Each structure stands twice: as structure tokens, then as C-alpha cells.
Amino acid sequence: PDGGVPMKVIEPREVPAMESGGGGLMSTAMDYARFLQCLRNKGELDGVRLLGPHTVDFMTADHLGHTPADGVLLPPGHGFGLGFAVRTHAGMSPVPGSVGLYYWGGIAGTTFFVDPALDMYAMLMIQAPNQRDYYRPLFRDMVYAALL
């Protein structure tokens, strides 16, 4: 369906032959939003502490140091935390966002970002693996353009 490339449908009830970290992670949009709300609140959701605030800070801090970032996966001006790409510089990135913003996405194009400086998060739920490099930056551009 996406450029003529055959798609393999993942059957969530089948036990995989091999575990794959986040590979095959499935969620509803509402549960994903609640997870992002928890991260935005530094580990708290609905008045319940699920992660310590220092844990969230550690997870979303740059752990690459001076390793250069260059590419679609990790563009200039970014580092990498524990499970997230992290914005480290204001002017070096080709996409908008505040220093401290963190994000990640799935193989089929789903993506999210949390911008602590603006106290917000956004997510895009798509299933277009061959077009994710087009839609992800467009999504972030559109979100930040709407804030102006």
C-alpha cells in the first residue's frame, strides 16, 4: 500500500520467536498520550508517582557527550538519552524545538516529542514507513507554527 512495498501485519497475540526491545510495541493513541503526559509531568500521572523526577531527568539527558550527531535519526544539535533523542543546541537543528526537547518514533512512522520548556507534548500516529522521513519533520514544523 505504501509505494508498492508489501506490508507485513504484526499479529499481537502471537508470541515472537525472539524478543526485540521496543520492536513491535503496540499501543492505543490514548495510552500513548497518557505515557507522554507522565513523561511531561516528570514521572507523575493522575497524582500517582510512576517514575522519579531524577530518573526522568537522567533518561532525557544527553549521554553521548561530544559524539557528533549527523543524520535523519540524530540531526545536528542533538544527543541521545536513554531511549530518546535529545535536543542539545538551539540553532543547529533543521527542525524547531527548545533545548531539552526529547523525542523518538516507531518504524512505521509514529513519532512523539516532549518539549519541557513549553510544557507540552505532541504525537503523530501514522503507518507509513516509507514516508516517515517526510512526515516527521513536517509534523514538528506544523506544531511549532501553530504556537506562534
Tell what function each PLM region has.
Residues 1-148:
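Catalytic loop of the DD-peptidase/beta-lactamase superfamily, centered on the K-T-G motif
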